[in-house]
């Protein structure tokens, strides 16, 4: 049985001063040394939150775009927001003013290859005029066009509407209808459009199945093998595997026509069975859930890690209900939450721990550290100046405080 040998001594003021300097240097190199194996299992993240307190028009974020000028556009259920890294500016619908948004409920934001900024709302789609800081709503036969999805293609941008697909052609600056459903049964919004191969595009109508659209023939066909009635998200990864989430039934993975994986909260580490969005980053699949934070799946071995809000940990992820994921050009992930605004997620290579109430798992019992020691099992033992001994588990990232040493000054720890 291992015991810890603790030696409490008095030092001169000069030695204390020198020791603190030496300890800070040692602390830096120590954590650089142990950080690499920890990072390979569970990276450190820095979170930046933009919510109502920062000026966001509403807390449910439905879409995000980082444009070519570096501005971050944020669409909510109640207005469009533009963030210039210093300030948030709101854009709202004003009745009777055709130069404003047609609706405050923003469904997507897109920037095409000509740097046109598109904003889709529940009452139509519009183009943003940067010169006049205003919007122009597009129409078809004199009526606003409702679209729910987009896809950038050669020579223009595809727009998926209710039983309809349009193409905005750069050469003519006109909107051309490519497909109209003949049967009213198929007047369903296409909520997602993803390219499957050179000719075919997959369309997710959510409650009415998944369809394929042929870019050469303009034919739309329902894929009969998808028989569920609530597809919340579809995603084609870099290995050409199709990931499909079904409301309340987890995540499916298909290789061609074959189902190769089905992850649920009961048969895997998936933290929640309701999934809102899927995004790939650095050979990992990020999965946004409705109550379990973000699950991150390795595309090599299908292993899981997750980012979640933890009770009593003020530095943990700020929300567990995530509606939208967006990967910006700098490879930073943004998470649009349902109640906590927009959360920026950035990889960092170090983290800091501060003093917390005694017994809290996510910090030190005293912020002044006198000594520490890593034992043969990889556990880090920390001696504090008046808070006793702290035990840190690098794998879980949690601390344990020892009441028997609560007010002690611990200046040396060894193993025997």
PLM region spans:
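Short, small-residue-biased leader/transition segments that mark boundaries at the very start
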Residues: 1-6
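Carboxylate-rich, polar loop motifs that coordinate divalent cations or form catalytic acidic clusters
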Residues: 7-416
């Amino acid at each position: 049985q291992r015991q810890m040998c603790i030696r409490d001594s008095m030092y001169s003021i000069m030695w204390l001063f020198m020791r603190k300097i030496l300890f800070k240097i040692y602390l830096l190199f120590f954590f650089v040394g142990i950080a690499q194996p920890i990072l390979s299992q569970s990276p450190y993240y820095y979170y930046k939150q933009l919510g109502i307190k920062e000026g966001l028009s509403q807390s449910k974020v439905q879409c995000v775009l980082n444009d070519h000028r570096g501005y971050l556009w944020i669409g909510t259920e109640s207005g469009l927001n533009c963030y210039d890294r210093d300030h948030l500016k709101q854009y709202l619908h004003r009745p009777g003013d055709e130069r404003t948004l047609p609706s405050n409920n923003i469904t997507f934001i897109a920037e095409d290859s000509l740097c046109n900024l598109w904003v889709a709302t529940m009452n139509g789609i519009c183009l943003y005029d940067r010169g006049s800081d205003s919007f122009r709503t597009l129409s078809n036969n004199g009526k606003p066009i409702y679209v729910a999805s987009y896809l950038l293609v050669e020579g223009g941008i595809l727009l998926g509407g209710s039983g309809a697909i349009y193409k905005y052609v750069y050469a003519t600056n006109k909107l051309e209808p490519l497909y109209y459903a003949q049967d009213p049964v198929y007047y369903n919004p296409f909520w997602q459009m993803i390219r499957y191969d050179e000719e075919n595009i997959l369309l997710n109508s959510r409650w009415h199945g998944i369809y394929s659209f042929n870019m050469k023939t303009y034919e739309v066909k329902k894929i009969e093998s998808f028989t569920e009635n609530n597809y919340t998200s579809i995603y084609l990864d870099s290995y050409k595997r199709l990931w499909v989430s079904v409301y309340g039934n987890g995540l499916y993975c298909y290789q061609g026509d074959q189902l190769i994986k089905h992850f649920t909260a009961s048969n895997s580490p998936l933290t929640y069975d309701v999934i809102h969005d899927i995004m790939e980053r650095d050979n990992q699949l990020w999965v946004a859930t409705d109550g379990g934070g973000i699950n991150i799946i390795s595309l090599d071995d299908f292993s899981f890690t997750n980012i979640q809000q933890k009770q009593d940990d003020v530095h943990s992820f700020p929300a567990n209900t995530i509606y939208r994921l967006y990967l910006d050009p700098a490879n930073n992930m943004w998470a649009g939450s349902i109640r906590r605004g927009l959360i920026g997620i950035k990889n960092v290579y170090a983290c800091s721990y501060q003093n917390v109430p005694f017994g809290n798992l996510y910090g030190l019992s005293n912020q002044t550290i006198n000594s520490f020691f890593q034992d043969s099992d990889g556990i880090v033992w920390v001696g504090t100046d008046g808070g006793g001994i702290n035990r840190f588990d690098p794998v879980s990232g949690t601390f344990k405080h020892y009441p028997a040493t609560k007010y002690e000054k611990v200046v040396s720890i060894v193993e025997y």
